[in-house]
């Protein structure tokens, strides 16, 4: 079972002659292609004329070819096969094209021209009439030799549908047509069509009723199942609606083609060429016995021919281009897929060995640790607190690149002890064994609990600018100023202590606490002053070599007000030498 659409508009050429309008031809081509894609197996190109017919109205409708359809829709064969499978239509069913003429009848003269002897009507496959008044409608139902009566239900009807006339037309084998494109218009038109067409549906009860599109554009063309659903608005059941676009159409086409090809609808008439001979003694060929009652003889398209034509157009494209072999690409991929190490690489990334800094308990930063130190002050107050910043990496002196130092430094443990005395407070820092200073331990029983801190310093040689700390990090001017003030205050305190020792003749019992180079060193005074021999032993133990001071990286010069001053270590050395004398 196949579905038909027997009303595809055809824009007629001008009366003076000529070819089809370019825009109309493109529209007809698109409509035919869309109908074929939706699963229809036959269409009729409808031409409408008004007035008196003439010889110029003979059929000149060119049927569409495979090449023209493929240009519009290259994948037409696959789409047609898909929709035909859904509709249950065999793929071997050819796509057929028919020609149709619709005559608008108003006068009696026009009605008289609708006869079987008119050569203009014989040139078309299907003859339809559209009555414009009551007389034309009655004549078409009773006497006109036509195949189809098409009624315009969009406007107010100029005649009444009489049941006897409708019944007479059905008995004569004439079919009535309803266009569903009128239902897809505005609400007013839809209401008018439904009210007028419902009467015709009730009287015919689906018998000799044909549903066609009459679509002026591609967007108004619907598939067979959609048309069946639309017919519920007119009161048609699904079976009768399906018959209106399939069975009834096929019966009407078979009838009109039989009347056109057979004499008295019994004897087949075929034209022979001048070179062909016919003999009654010879049996008829098999081609003559094979007759398709639905074929008009022209414009039939097989789906296989359509597929072959499509393949032929793509032969050159297949030769010039090579398809991607996705199977080989997928086989080359690892089963577990790509991992991060496959993309980044398996080589280990060399981490720069930099000086490690362990944060103190006071600060939460991972790179900077602050060491607070206090100088000797009054009984209950600390004189001054300074902050020394330390970082993870040391930057080389090369201007073009920065390289972290690769020397692994030994961890140095400093024990900060808060010593209390009758005259002042101080901080004791125990330095590492590699430094040139040896520090004495605090002998006070009132010493506070130890606070452990781990830092690392560099051992590489290199000159440092006066404005940098011993780790090579630039210091702010405020820090430099604080360091300079601390150095001067320390020198003053040492001079005062030496004078007191000279006048009293007693040596101080205080222990000297010296931090790493660049830090403060404080002397805590006590009541008892040791003997000069004890001071000599302390100086020998400290082993301060002033001559080798320039060769150590730990010694840093402190600048104050753009003037160079002696280092703290040199001043301590001189002070201790005077004290020994």
UniProtKB/Swiss-Prot annotation:
<dbReference type="GO" id="GO:0005730">
    <property type="term" value="C:nucleolus"/>
</dbReference>
<dbReference type="GO" id="GO:0008033">
    <property type="term" value="P:tRNA processing"/>
</dbReference>
<dbReference type="GO" id="GO:0005739">
    <property type="term" value="C:mitochondrion"/>
</dbReference>
<dbReference type="InterPro" id="IPR002738">
    <property type="entry name" value="RNase_P_p30"/>
</dbReference>
<dbReference type="GO" id="GO:0006364">
    <property type="term" value="P:rRNA processing"/>
</dbReference>
<dbReference type="GO" id="GO:0016787">
    <property type="term" value="F:hydrolase activity"/>
</dbReference>
<protein>
    <recommendedName>
        <fullName>Protein GAMETOPHYTE DEFECTIVE 1</fullName>
        <ecNumber>3.1.26.-</ecNumber>
    </recommendedName>
</protein>
<keyword id="KW-0496">Mitochondrion</keyword>
<keyword id="KW-0539">Nucleus</keyword>
<keyword id="KW-0698">rRNA processing</keyword>
<feature type="compositionally biased region" description="Polar residues">
    <location>
        <begin position="452"/>
        <end position="467"/>
    </location>
</feature>
<keyword id="KW-0378">Hydrolase</keyword>
<comment type="similarity">
    <text>Belongs to the eukaryotic/archaeal RNase P protein component 3 family.</text>
</comment>
<comment type="subunit">
    <text>Probable component of nuclear RNase P and RNase MRP ribonucleoproteins. Interacts with POP5.</text>
</comment>
<feature type="compositionally biased region" description="Basic and acidic residues">
    <location>
        <begin position="496"/>
        <end position="512"/>
    </location>
</feature>
<dbReference type="InterPro" id="IPR016195">
    <property type="entry name" value="Pol/histidinol_Pase-like"/>
</dbReference>
<feature type="region of interest" description="Disordered">
    <location>
        <begin position="452"/>
        <end position="512"/>
    </location>
</feature>
<dbReference type="Pfam" id="PF01876">
    <property type="entry name" value="RNase_P_p30"/>
</dbReference>
<comment type="function">
    <text>Probable component of ribonuclease P, a ribonucleoprotein complex that generates mature tRNA molecules by cleaving their 5'-ends. May also be a component of the MRP ribonuclease complex, which cleaves pre-rRNA sequences. Required for female gametophyte development and male competence.</text>
</comment>
<dbReference type="GO" id="GO:0005634">
    <property type="term" value="C:nucleus"/>
</dbReference>
<keyword id="KW-0819">tRNA processing</keyword>
